[in-house]
Amino acid sequence: MPEGKKPAEDLYSAKTHLHQPVPEVSTVNATALPADAPEGALPSEVRPEIVTWEKLCEAIKASGKAYNMEMITKAYDLANKAHNGVCRRSGEPYICHPLAVARLVLDLGMDSESIAAALLHDVVEDTPTTLEDLTAAFGEEVALLVDGVTKLTKIQFSNIEELQAENLRKMLLAMSRDVRVMIIKLCDRLHNMRTGDAWPEQKRRDKARETMEVYAPIANRLGILNVKEELEDRSLHYLDPVGYEEISKMLSERAGEEFLARVSGVIEQRLKESGIEGATIKRRVKSIYGIYRKTIMQNKSFDEIYDI
């Protein structure tokens, strides 16, 4: 990195005025694993299940929140028709991608307009559908969300100077107008990184670097920490597959989630015995990239890191 340049994280920590407050974002299920995932697996190690329209509807119902199903269904129908006959590089029908993005947006607790926009986020860029068509069908709010995501998608990061200057400002500007645009884009990038094995090797590395330098810091700024960590882990998997696999293997050999749950139960029981009621013990396994970064920056071996 050239002298005088700040890392992307520092740029994002600068004071930026958001014209709209950041919505309350849930981080509980944003990177939930499929039911058949191996025990102790990290989100970055498991290929996500394919989200169907039926599964999305079930998830909406299970959320217990009141959503505008008429709008969401209409958005799905339009997207399904617009992407009909198109497949992703992985071979899946293209509609699987907007459905997966919509599910991630739902899991983050976003509103009906955000879910509809997630379903529609690629139709203006990739199909004959126009912004005017969306405005007529869904109103200006949904159309503007889709337009915002489309504009972010068109931003290119060809070198580190651009990354830290003009394009970064454009991203922050889009974020300040309506933060929902950025949340949809983060979910779009997360699903693309989950399915990035189908990309050519150079594209995987380029997307991973862009994700690490741009999208993960934004997720961190918005407080969506599990999305941030999965973006970092999946990026590391493409940028340094050997380092990723080494840490992943060592983590699997250490105490996993089952052990943490058992220890948490013991602590909660001891607290109750001491007269402390209602205490909640929170636990998490440190991300692969978090461990990787610590070993590099602090020049420590895996066995010297104790906060895993």
Label each PLM-derived region with a short phrase.
Residues 2-308:
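Active-site helical microenvironments for divalent-metal-assisted chemistry
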